[in-house]
Amino acid sequence: MPTLKFNHSILQYMQDKNGITYNSEEWVEKMPSIGCVVEENDEEGIEIEIFPDRTDLLSHETIARAARSFLNSVEYSPDFEVLEGDIVVTVDPTIEKIRPVILCAIVRGVDNGVSSKEKNDFIQSLMEHQEKLHLTLGRKRKFASIGVHDLTKLKPPFNVISVDKNHSFIPLAEEKEMTIEEILKSHPKGREYAHLMDNIDKYPVIVDSEDKVLSFPPIINGDHTTVTEDTKDFLIDVTGWDERSCEACLLLICLSLAERGGEVESIQLKNWDGEKKYVPRGNSKIHKVPDRLIEKILGMSLNKKEIAKSIKKMGGTLIESRTVTDGPDKVEKWADCMVGEKEHIIAMPRWRSDIMHPIDIVEDIAIGYGYDNLPEQLSTVHLDAIPLPSSGLHRRISASFCALGLQETQSLTLSNYRDQFEKVRWLEADKSTTISNPITQDHTMLRQHILPSLLNLLSANRHHELPQKVHELGTVVRNSKNMNRVAWACAEVGGGFSAAKGIASALLRDLGANSEEIEWEKVEPNEGPWIKGRGAKIIIQGVEVGQIGELDPNVSFEFGLRVPIQAGEFDVNALGQLIPDPVL
């Protein structure tokens, strides 16, 4: 969940513009109800963790507006005023396969403040809002990316075209032209988001009537459109692959600027498929909510006045409450409005992308009404919980290792190819599940083995005294399927193959394995992390269930370890199938 620091001075400025007194203590007490967990409130500002579904609260302007409705009962129309503009944006058909969703808007006359500090605060707030939307709704610019430009520096109409890698322009904050290829390879933003341009040989750019590049989405803007402290007229472009995310991003940026007095104008979009339309749309979304659903979820019946008041605090409007005359004769889904039942027609702002079902409206009604005002009653739904079939086996394995003096650990399921295979000399037995856009080189795939995670743990604790004995029972992923494995590792002087065999034998005994069915087979040299002649496969009923042994010093050195280590790893799924539970 994104955590933001909202400056008291900006919030005070926004509330003063609307005749509302800003009280940070009131925010601390009441704002968590609408998805704003207050982490800190100091002299500079208020730090708030925003729930993932409330992306409409990521800027000073939008959260201040929501607070006015929720805390001060200020009523706003769910319809967003958008004036019809005459600027045209034409999208070339080649864009369809590259970045198919293109939306734009114009905002004029934004009040960015009087003093230099107020103007600087505005620019900083706008940039932070843009990046938070990239991170959340935009899914790191994959679903949607936003460009904000100084309109006065541009010459409409605009065109969205595709160019090759040799096309050049001056990117934001640079002094000389760079080609598309150079930007993707050497510019910080280019390197960060180059993966979004994989497997294409044409790249999207937005140009004005003089063929000057405004934007190379989703990477970077052109330098000549840079927004400054004196910018009052804006062009906003949003491009991506998910139309719902793109529309929400565009409306939320427009809303922030409109809250500062800006007038939003639509543009005429001539899309790649030949469709002509005006965007953005400011009209609200209409939802039908059965009265039965409200009563079922809240445990009480609310009258029309109470519903209207509650939804108003969440930015919506109750249009009417009526008896259904046309619809199904029986209820098949919770949200169905049956003939003869009462339903409520509710309008919500289009930028509330988190509202996808009538149950979301019921949640907003509950928040507006106040959870403290709802009746207390025990649930009438009785649910019996039973253990998973595998939980008994997992519990017995952990108990056995703990009884042997091995501390239980839990590590990340994420790992990397070098740790999983190259360092420990295990072959990639099954198809690996890799991360398409890894943040670090250490976490590029989902692990197939657990032992490398334990060796990394011992490496991180190598400065502590010996012995160190650890085990982990966890999830691995092979061929896109979750499986369970257990591994142990002991860093101790004098512990060798005999110690490893002792631990393995004790575990199998505790699980109820028949010793006559257990076979110990020598591991071939360099097949796994073991010293030659000191590694073994454990076979039950002809099936290999695990390997144990003494680690080759060369393998230990790869993990930064300089002490003798004995270890092993078992396939828990195989153990469960081959060793019957002696208790059952």
Per-region residue spans from a language model:
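Extended beta-strand-rich architecture
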Residues: 2, 19, 33-36, 41-44, ...
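Generic N-terminal amphipathic, Lys/Arg-enriched alpha-helix
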Residues: 4-15, 230
